[in-house]
């Protein structure tokens, strides 16, 4: 059942933490709370979220992503966890299976950011896709599982004065959502400045 928007430009965000151990209560999930905190700081336009905590099972991941986009009506879905080379890491495969358009630039940029910190970032297989239905479309992106890495990939790298050195991936998300017919997203510029061409900017 689709969620009711309280405002025409309210962004519906799906947050999915994918972990065998967290989903069975072995340890507490950190990915979704980190994302909730980040969006609370970063977005100035209205938004609401739908969260899920599921195991590393490809069919379950696919069903969850489809539910969030097709049934709930999310405009943006972010996953955390399950993107490494281990046998149980199947989040990218599930994401690609439900997508209608691959968006490789997001994964490429995430790895470029993370490689500034750890050489093992090259082992990460994060992907992003657009999922389209006859009357709706959404951007689905895989993120790292650690809160620090989540923030770094979304915001990018800044120098001591706060000037951007390497853009974070979220800078491109608002315009991407524009292009697929979603709500107009506005951000707190000192956290993450949204980039749009001048022709796509709304008058203040």
Could you describe each region identified by the protein language model?
Residues 1-204:
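Non-catalytic beta/alpha edge segments that cap or flank active sites
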């Amino acid at each position: 059942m689709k969620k009711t928007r309280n405002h025409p430009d309210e962004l519906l965000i799906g947050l999915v933490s994918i972990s065998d151990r967290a989903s069975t209560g072995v340890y507490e999930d950190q990915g979704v709370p980190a994302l909730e905190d980040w969006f609370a700081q970063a977005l100035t336009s209205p938004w609401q979220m739908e969260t899920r905590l599921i195991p590393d099972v490809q069919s379950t991941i696919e069903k969850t992503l489809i539910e969030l986009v097709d049934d709930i009506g999310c405009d943006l879905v972010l996953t955390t966890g399950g993107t490494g080379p281990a046998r149980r890491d199947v989040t990218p495969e599930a994401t690609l299976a439900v997508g209608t358009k691959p968006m490789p630039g997001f994964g490429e940029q995430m790895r470029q950011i993370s490689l500034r910190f750890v050489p093992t970032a090259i082992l990460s297989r994060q992907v992003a896709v657009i999922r389209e239905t006859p009357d709706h479309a959404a951007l689905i992106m895989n993120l790292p599982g650690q809160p620090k890495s989540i923030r770094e990939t979304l915001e990018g790298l800044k120098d001591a004065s706060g000037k951007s050195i390497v853009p974070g991936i979220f800078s491109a998300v608002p315009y991407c959502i524009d292009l697929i017919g979603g709500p107009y997203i506005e951000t707190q510029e000192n956290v993450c400045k949204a980039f749009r061409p001048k022709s796509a900017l709304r008058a203040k």
